[in-house]
Curated annotation (Swiss-Prot):
Protein species of origin: Fusobacterium nucleatum subsp. nucleatum (strain ATCC 25586 / DSM 15643 / BCRC 10681 / CIP 101130 / JCM 8532 / KCTC 2640 / LMG 13131 / VPI 4355)
Gene Ontology terms: cellular component: large ribosomal subunit
Gene: rpmF
GO biological process: translation
Protein family (similarity comment): Belongs to the bacterial ribosomal protein bL32 family.
Keyword set, alphabetical order: Ribonucleoprotein, Ribosomal protein
Protein name: Large ribosomal subunit protein bL32
Keyword Ribosomal protein: yes
Length: 59
């Protein structure tokens, strides 16, 4: 069975993990109702996407 010949250093381990960081969700405000929504997605408050009504909402 294969085993490592040398111990992996902290620097090498951290360089390997440099791309594992989490990023924050991109929030924007809806142009129609002003509610916060995720970028490039339908607004859950008013159902609007790029100026067109996509979802039916109970208002």
């Amino acid at each position: 069975m294969a085993v490592p010949k040398k111990k992996t250093s902290k620097a090498k381990k951290n360089m390997r993990r440099s791309h594992h960081a989490l990023t924050a969700i991109g929030l924007v405000t809806c142009e129609k109702c002003g509610a916060p929504k995720r970028a490039h997605r339908v607004c859950l408050e008013c159902g609007d996407y790029k100026g067109t009504q996509v979802l039916e909402t109970a208002e």
